Amino acid sequence: MLQTKDYEFWFVTGSQHLYGEETLELVDQHAKSICEGLSGISSRYKITHKPVVTSPETIRELLREAEYSETCAGIITWMHTFSPAKMWIEGLSSYQKPLMHLHTQYNRDIPWGTIDMDFMNSNQSAHGDREYGYINSRMGLSRKVIAGYWDDEEVKKEMSQWMDTAAALNESRHIKVARFGDNMRHVAVTDGDKVGAHIQFGWQVDGYGIGDLVEVMDRITDDEVDTLYAEYDRLYVISEETKRDEAKVASIKEQAKIELGLTAFLEQGGYTAFTTSFEVLHGMKQLPGLAVQRLMEKGYGFAGEGDWKTAALVRMMKIMAKGKRTSFMEDYTYHFEPGNEMILGSHMLEVCPTVALDQPKIEVHSLSIGGKEDPARLVFNGISGSAIQASIVDIGGRFRLVLNEVNGQEIEKDMPNLPVARVLWKPEPSLKTAAEAWILAGGAHHTCLSYELTAEQMLDWAEMAGIESVLISRDTTIHKLKHELKWNEALYRLQK
């Protein structure tokens, strides 16, 4: 798997000197206790307790330190007592990383029999957080507000998901996309403003001729290929019939050579996402298939036909999902059976095996597109369950994230003449409304499909990144969506 930085999140508690040292010590103890209680909510990122801030100077210095820290991916703020919000203005003015406002309190219940004014004075986040919330709103700051008892499982889940999103935002600012060949000729939606994306997201897109990859592949040894083929044999199903067929074994080994060449090329250039094009294969024996699936399984972002936006999006979502159950996808064909409308998603070859229901099979079949030799690919049916589809498009002067909540379906019918990876789903609120809404929003035919992430996480990411977002869900109606798109258009024109 591709590795990401070991990020941390700083837990910052606000108060003021008015309460005296004894109360401030209690506030700090409570903050430490909460941090300890939250320590296990993320398998990857830790929450670091910071001293209670009580003045404009301490707030400014702490937020400045967080802003310049290489490992701090964001801060979690909480007002245990009342913290006059004017103290936060200077610090928040220069802070640009993800910000969470945790609206909670140390105690879950009111101590009915013993409560007194001392308790009230030292446990007043119910109105201290409102003061802090006001100044955030007054300053127009983007932030995540989570309300509830800090030890509640739902609150912990929300916090963990936000941390994954914030870390992915930080990490994705360093995404580099290697683009082998250009855009598929005459295709509109896969093109876009690369300079704008570099400014907005930090995504760097570099173009290469396919010969640059072939040159690296030519240096791969037979021993390296044989070793990787043996790994394929351990991890996936290769039929005995295929193993006896020298031409098919050679085809699988050619994909191993492509995988090794791609890996070497990407590692050397520091790339974590890439695109290919079936129109640009000079010097290649096959269209990359199995090789691409393997790299996605390791965490690389990918999209076909030069679609650099989707490739970067897949990489970003894989960071957020910790590499789990997330893949490049394409809406391919519809099932219009009344009351059971579904979409079959696939691509020519390139669907990530992290969404496979069972152990994938390596098969070799002809592929008319590209005009090359028969390519090896992983063949499998996709899993069922709740998922999201995400598409990022250049809508002219800005980027738009289009989301659709979907429900993955178990594939119950055999498709013996379709030897590719395939996934079946029902979109919310229905195929008819979802398709109409998607088309009205300008969503692409290439997407990232994830069973691991939620629409809320992606909406949070869009807000952090400063781009427009459109969600198609069970509550969507075409009438409301059209108005939303018009309002968004007006808003972004005003912001120019």
UniProtKB/Swiss-Prot annotation:
Its EC number is 5.3.1.4. The keyword Isomerase applies. GO terms for biological process: L-arabinose catabolic process to xylulose 5-phosphate. The keyword Manganese applies. Induction: Transcription is repressed by glucose and by the binding of AraR to the operon promoter. L-arabinose acts as an inducer by inhibiting the binding of AraR to the DNA, thus allowing expression of the gene. SUPFAM superfamilies: FucI/AraA C-terminal domain-like, FucI/AraA N-terminal and middle domains. Transmembrane segments: none annotated. Coiled coil: none annotated. GO terms for cellular component: cytosol. Catalyzes the conversion of L-arabinose to L-ribulose. PANTHER family: L-ARABINOSE ISOMERASE. Belongs to the arabinose isomerase family. This is L-arabinose isomerase. It comes from Bacillus subtilis (strain 168).
